[in-house]
Amino acid sequence: MAFRSRREKLRSILSGPGCIHPGSVYDAISIRIAEDLGFPLGMFGGSVASLAVLGDPDITLITLTELAEQMRRMSRASALPVLVDADHGYGNALNVRRTVQELETAGAAGLTIEDTLLPAAFGEAKTQLISLEEGVGKMKAALSGRSDPTLVIMGRTGAAAITSLDDTIRRAQAYEATGVDALFFTGIKSRAELEAVAAATHLPIVLGGAPEELNAPDYLAGQRVRIALQGHAPIAAATQAVHDTLKALREGAPPKALKGLASAELTSRVMREAETKARGADVLGFKK
């Protein structure tokens, strides 16, 4: 299948001995830059998807169609494997199945399904979780939705920050029993908590939003953490750069005086200009 090699690369990361940091990607430009810099994996987060596609905060306003289409654009632009934050699967367990099908055909190497109650319930300001039973149903639905067995399905829980460590372990063990390929934890606050969930489970671990004391790669690898997220700085940097450039122009700065712009060489490389010209020479008679 067209995307199988990307999925096998993600599986090799999960089965390997080390812990890697993925590059946060959100469009064709960012994924090509991450690929060129040698990142082994891209992470397409829900928050950056909402910001890049809609300009909205991370409150589950983006639709599955919009998420999958953005993933499809990135898959076309780059061969970098991408792990997609599929949030709650955009509905109930049947919706989760559809979500997996759409993201699989869009070229995702893997995806996460979480047990957060989304969108937020009426009258509830605090983040809530769905029941363990509903979470298990979503994991089973996700697994039944894939047609390519190499597509990586991860069960994600934020219970560590919402309920308790004991609940985190119960949920992780239940999701593991469904046959998912890895466990994704957010809200882990200490080494003791990480060691507890690692001791109680067997699957590869993905860690998001961890404190500074959990950022030692060798230590993480020893706890079966194979992927550790580092946030989404690239889109924040891009937002600031666009703001500063437009502000300078609005205030009268001449375009040639602007600083921090991409060079012609970098722009050409990111847009794959040489490859496009070569294809044009072959099929349109362009001069090389």
From Swiss-Prot:
Record keyword Magnesium present: yes
Enzyme class of the recorded protein, top EC level: lyase
Positions with a binding annotation for substrate: 47, 156, 232
Cross-referenced CDD domains: ICL_PEPM (cd00377)
Family annotation (SUPFAM superfamilies): Phosphoenolpyruvate/pyruvate domain
Binding of Mg(2+), residues: 85
GO molecular function terms listed in the Swiss-Prot or TrEMBL record: magnesium ion binding; methylisocitrate lyase activity; oxaloacetate decarboxylase activity
Keywords: Decarboxylase, Lyase, Magnesium, Metal-binding
E.C. number(s) listed in UniProt: 4.1.1.112
Requisite cofactors: Mg(2+)
Role description: Catalyzes the decarboxylation of oxaloacetate into pyruvate. Seems to play a role in maintaining cellular concentrations of bicarbonate and pyruvate.
SUBUNIT field: Homotetramer; dimer of dimers.
Family: Belongs to the isocitrate lyase/PEP mutase superfamily. Oxaloacetate decarboxylase family.
HAMAP family: OadC
Protein name as annotated: Oxaloacetate decarboxylase
Species in which this protein is naturally found: Bradyrhizobium diazoefficiens (strain JCM 10833 / BCRC 13528 / IAM 13628 / NBRC 14792 / USDA 110)
Lineage: Bacteria, Pseudomonadati, Pseudomonadota, Alphaproteobacteria, Hyphomicrobiales
